[in-house]
Amino acid sequence: MEKGNKIIAACITGISIIIFGLILKAGIDNFTNKDRKVTVKGLSEIEIPADRVTWSIAAYETGNDLPSLYGRMTSTVNKVTAFLKEHGIQEEEISVNPPDVDDRVSNRYSNEFIPFNYKLTTRVSVTSRNVDLVKEIIGRQGELISQGIALGGYNSINYEYTGFQDMKPAMMEEAIANAQATAKQFAKNSGSKLHKIITADQGQFSVYSKENDPSIMKIRVVTTITYSLKD
């Protein structure tokens, strides 16, 4: 009887050791698999023509009599707006800023000679979706100078793509797909399989003009995703 009890106890101990070993192995495997991961980046980038442009034309007049100077500035603004309309710009696409008055005498910080007392500067701005037309007119602004209009050195041109928000979902989908493809290739090369997403960064969109052609916009997004791996 005592011998039988010893056999039973030995069997129970053996089975317990086997079960403990299996549990320990599963725990180690789970720990190993949990710790295996890969972090990849996915890119989506496109180039697209701008669909809106804002062109700001700075013009100035100088003189000593402010009322007379204001009259000349009014004439200058009329010439600029007439030039724009003559070349196809619509009335509602044109805006005119009030003139900025620079009192050269009051703002003088030295005894240097100042040939005129006042400088008036104004801006005539064009905001249009006809980007190609505005680009063409920009190339002809020398015609304003030939009319005696003094253009300032602060003319600015700003191109935009207003449909940017509508493109976000498709670009994010492409960036995620590219990240997943990279992760799958990595898993294949390492003899593993792609499991689930651990973390995902939506990524920041950037929109900027090409250096050699500012009217072409580059839209770019990079997403970062970390996947777990399994055997």
Residue ranges of predicted features:
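Short, charged, surface-exposed interaction patches
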Residues: 2-10, 16-231
